[in-house]
């Protein structure tokens, strides 16, 4: 649903429509978008959608997979039959409850979250562009995650490359 590097919101509805035309299931990784923008699986028309609790200030190591009714999946690990036979392992009940609580808080706060996150982003972006005239913002100018800011500096590509090499990235 959203790119975690540059923050661009992807056109999920349109992409899902295209896959439906060709009889292909559509999965969206909505981990970055959860709690920041509305995610309505019916409006998005996705077949599968992934979420992660830690992006909602919930416990790490807990996630969710939405599966549209009628979508048939096959397990890749066999065993105890948890998760309706799709995953074998003991469920992390405490983590699941924590995820549920975090999701509830995120849902309650969603309406004001975008403006809360965008105000400092815009101040920072303006300050950077004013102070560092060779800077530029990555990603779409308006279709982007609330609070997300990713920028670069013209003419500094070699310096960045050297830094990444020095950091062994």
Language model regions located:
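Pyridoxal 5′-phosphate
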Residues: 1-169
């Amino acid at each position: 649903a959203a790119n975690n590097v540059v923050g661009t919101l992807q056109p999920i509805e349109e992409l899902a429509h295209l896959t439906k035309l060709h009889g292909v299931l559509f999965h969206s990784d909505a981990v970055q978008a959860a709690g920041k923008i509305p995610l309505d699986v019916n409006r998005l028309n996705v077949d599968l959608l992934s979420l992660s609790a830690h992006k909602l200030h919930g416990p790490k190591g807990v996630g969710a997979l939405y599966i549209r009714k009628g979508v048939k999946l096959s397990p890749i690990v066999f065993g105890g039959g948890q998760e309706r036979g799709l995953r074998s392992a003991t469920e992390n009940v405490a983590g699941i409850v924590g995820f549920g609580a975090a999701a509830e808080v995120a849902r309650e706060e969603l309406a004001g979250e975008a403006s809360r996150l965008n105000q400092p982003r815009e101040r920072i972006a303006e300050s950077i562009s004013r102070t560092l005239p060779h800077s530029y913002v990555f990603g779409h100018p308006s279709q982007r995650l609330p609070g997300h800011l990713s920028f670069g500096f013209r003419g500094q590509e070699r310096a960045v490359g050297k830094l990444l090499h020095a950091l062994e990235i």
